Amino acid sequence: MSQSRHRAEAPPLEREDSGTFSLGKMITAKPGKTPIQVLHEYGMKTKNIPVYECERSDVQIHVPTFTFRVTVGDITCTGEGTSKKLAKHRAAEAAINILKANASICFAVPDPLMPDPSKQPKNQLNPIGSLQELAIHHGWRLPEYTLSQEGGPAHKREYTTICRLESFMETGKGASKKQAKRNAAEKFLAKFSNISPENHISLTNVVGHSLGCTWHSLRNSPGEKINLLKRSLLSIPNTDYIQLLSEIAKEQGFNITYLDIDELSANGQYQCLAELSTSPITVCHGSGISCGNAQSDAAHNALQYLKIIAERK
């Protein structure tokens, strides 16, 4: 599900003397990138950082549904999924498809040697983009912006936006939605920059403490269960994969949620998703002749993935 607000006509998406940038060429040059990564890199090059907002979150139903909106330049698209990450993934994918398919959409890449002082004062950073870059650099989930309040008279509107980054939350207010987002992001950046070196607490440790199980902590964990997984074969018959995954989750500090899919697979088998609250979130698919078998298969696939991640250096 996606929509676009862009209407202006422009030349095709190519990097030429006019200063435009080719999204298609970038995708070809960087295979294997996720839609979120591709769109972010595109936004960085065109000075149009993608901004993600959670529009809807239905977690009280059997299969949770999340809806995220991504805005990059004049393009706005939405995506739905059973996890926040999947919803963001689909929103980014929809935006990329529009950018690739619509030759009338073209962003100009500003000349770094000729900045526009009327749009951005010298040395002033974009706090929304800076916070997103910080999250990507440290492997955190991307910041989420939610419009929580809108009020005031027509000539003096005030917007309140909540920005969430892992377990942290900041609120920003402004005369426009964009200004409210900027203020919330600025508060986060100020909070992180105020962590003094005298306290011997790094920014990564402060936020990382709230992440639970990260790939870095998994690789360096002295835990008995995760190290046993590194040495074990996952093809031994009659192994209780659900129990084994549960023991590792308890040791490493993440939760497991099994989401049964109502629709049968193409070959008539039951399907299930195992969602691990690691950082980033891990979702693995499983199938079988029963719901229980599908869950066991999903747990098996999750264990295989954790084993690969834990063994990497």
UniProtKB/Swiss-Prot annotation:
* Pfam families given in the database record: dsrm (PF00035)
| Any one GO molecular function term | double-stranded RNA binding
Origin: domain of life: Eukaryota
Cellular localization per UniProt: Cytoplasm, Perinuclear region; Cytoplasm
The Gene Ontology biological process annotation of the record reads: antiviral innate immune response; cellular response to oxidative stress; immune response; middle ear morphogenesis; miRNA processing; negative regulation of cell population proliferation; outer ear morphogenesis; positive regulation of intrinsic apoptotic signaling pathway
Q: Identify its protein family.
A: Belongs to the PRKRA family.
| Family annotation (PANTHER family) | INTERFERON-INDUCIBLE DOUBLE-STRANDED RNA-DEPENDENT PROTEIN KINASE ACTIVATOR A (PTHR46205:SF2), LOQUACIOUS, ISOFORM B (PTHR46205)
Can you name this protein? Answer: Interferon-inducible double-stranded RNA-dependent protein kinase activator A
Its source organism is: Homo sapiens (Human)
